[in-house]
Amino acid sequence: MAEGSELMSRLMSENADLKKQVRLLKENQMLKRLLSESCQESCGRGSRDLLYPKVPTYPEACSPGNGGPDFGRFAGVPDTPSQLPTSSLEDLLCSHAPLSSEDEASPGCATTSQMPFKSFLSPSELHSRIADRKLSPLLSPLQDSLADKTLLEPREISRPKKVCFSESNLPTGDRSRRTYYLNEIQSFSGAEKDGRIVGEIAFQLDRRILAYVFPGVTRLYGFTVSNIPEKIKQTSIKSLDGSVDEKKLRELTHRYLTLTARLEKLGYSREVHPVFSEFLINTYGILKQRPDLRANPLHSSPAALRKLVIDIVPPKFLGDSLLLLNCLCELSKEDSKPLFAW
């Protein structure tokens, strides 16, 4: 009889401990919800106070016209981005606006994670409940660790996108330079279709440059903006005797230097942007079919293309991407052809 009474008393004690553990788990869930709501509200107030630098203006319309001759499209585009020198972008992106989201913490989130917890439980009550939880031998270590983990989970805070662009109208000596590295390309995001338009912008600019430097050449396989000087020498060699056609060499060189001089006024760099265009094409790809301007007005709207680039391209590469779009718009305006003419 005494053994039965002792067993009953022990079962009742264990049952009370189990109820206490369940109550603690519910309180942990409530604390987690309070912490999350408080941090989101504080971060929401802080993000509304941030100032966004203005995006430079670009031509809002291009004169419609007939597309240029179809020179074909890239046969294959690698899935992995090409590697550029680590300092290849330092001459194009200015540092008047901070770009790295890791450089500064979001305002209002430093202390909010502790305030709801302290206001919900006093230190003495919290200490007593933690002590009670350690008394129960029936709660598995896995359940205990999960209960504690709910209070320590990191909160993902959405931060506003910062935009920086090259100030090509400033004197060279007045510009502040900063180096950015291509191994930070992990922030690239966006739908595949929209991303292909970013690569298409770079592709169309390259094709426009090649078509201008090499007029009449319909097969541009192996031609890139980066190797234009080498290709000028190759195309200037006479096929009959292998001698150099000096007249053709001077003509092609003059066309190349004239065009790059016009683009350099917009901030284009022969050392940086040809390789950067290849990088965008390899990263995003290009449109699978020749753009249909009547079916998709986006391809003929500089404003819509600029908004798409801002939404997709990471901040550290946004300035140079917008510069390529600006150059494409200027060339399209001068030759009276659509933006996507090839």
Swiss-Prot record:
GO CC, any one term: cytoplasm
Amino-acid biosynthesis is among the record's keywords: no
Primary localisation category: cytoplasm
Compartments, as annotated in UniProt: Cytoplasm
Lineage, opening ranks: Eukaryota, Metazoa, Chordata, Craniata, Vertebrata
Keywords per UniProt: Cytoplasm, Phosphoprotein
Name used for this protein in its record: Speriolin-like protein
GO BP annotations listed: actin polymerization or depolymerization; positive regulation of cAMP/PKA signal transduction; spermatogenesis
InterPro entries for the chain: SPATC1, Speriolin_C, Speriolin_N
Modified residues (Phosphoserine): S63, S136
Family statement drawn from the similarity comment of this UniProt entry: Belongs to the speriolin family.
GO function terms (MF aspect): protein kinase A regulatory subunit binding
